[in-house]
Amino acid sequence: MFGIASSLFELGGLIVMHDASGCNSTYDTHDEPRWYDTPSMVYISGLNEIDTIQGNDQRLVDDIAEAVEAAHPRFVAIGGSPMPNAIGTDFKAIERLVAARTGLPTLGFRTDGIHSYLPGAGGAYVWLAKTFVKAPEKAPQRPAKRVNLLGLTPLDFSVVGNATTLKQIVTDAGFTLQSSWSMGDTLDQLATAANADVNVVLSSTAFYLAQYLRDTYGIPYVVGIPMGEKGTADWLEALRNCDSSYLTGFTGQEKYIRAQYALADLNAWKTEQAYDDTPCDVLVIGEPVYLLSMKAFLQQELGLSDVRLLCPLADAPRWLLEQMEVASVEDVIRQECHKARRVIADPIYARLLPDEKDKFISMPHEAYSGRHYHADMPIFVGPSFTAWMKEKLMEGEGL
């Protein structure tokens, strides 16, 4: 649910979290750093016990209509929490009722508060593209000149300068930044995304969107984040050549999958073992695109050959999980951390091994620990990240 809120936050829409009163701070002040200095229209529905028992959705529709009259949003998006999911709230029906009542484009997405942020943000992005992106003025060209940045939200990049650095890298290399999904851009600019020559998938939240734009407008996609000097140069070259095989080995023709499919799997406790019990130099824990980018950086820039990847997000797009272990069970993650000489992860993971805290390199992830470690978040995009990581690897237990 907070994936929807983050992906749509800056775009002028009315975002409604269908949950109990007081839960707004969970989605905003804890997980959304833009809340403090960026205008927004994120509301909580104030779901109460009697409406839950009686299935009274009319109050929700009435309240949304009243808010629309007061705030004049461009669209309405409604996401669910565990309780509406448990009672079987029909979000598609609410979507139709709200659209008919307000005359605005409306998204009703059955998030459940159980899965991660990836399906919600991914579904919201695809809906945005289907609803607002206009037909292109010309076909994609090679070498690429116009770039869409997809999946750029504080959940994966925070607001410490990663987004600004990323955009600077793109424009300094001679590219035109067509649109940024969805930090520092407007809904009108996102509507021109079909004019791009290449899409960059910066996080798993955007993989569904990249596939949709490929199938609809023929725009190829590249998966990855520029990390380090060599990583940045290789990333820019992949953009110019529209090289979908960069980092992933993809052909660019991977079958389109829907974000809703991830929500259909209710087994959140998964383990797909990928490694044996032998020790390794470095274990990296996080979101799949970040993991693939970090592995390339550690191997090619710092010469570390034995790098393992662990993704705790079992609902990530399956195409992105093929080169890593998937584990959301705490004991399994603890065992993998124990095998590694160094662990690069959100600092909360250090609590799994209280006697081995020196082996952990802190890389806070806003989607995991929220605002708790915001002050420690580094700029991990671009050439300057090399010096930062070298220093961290030499601290503690070293390598």
Locate the predicted segments by residue:
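An N-terminal assembly and electron-transfer interface module characteristic of large anaerobic redox
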Residues: 1-399
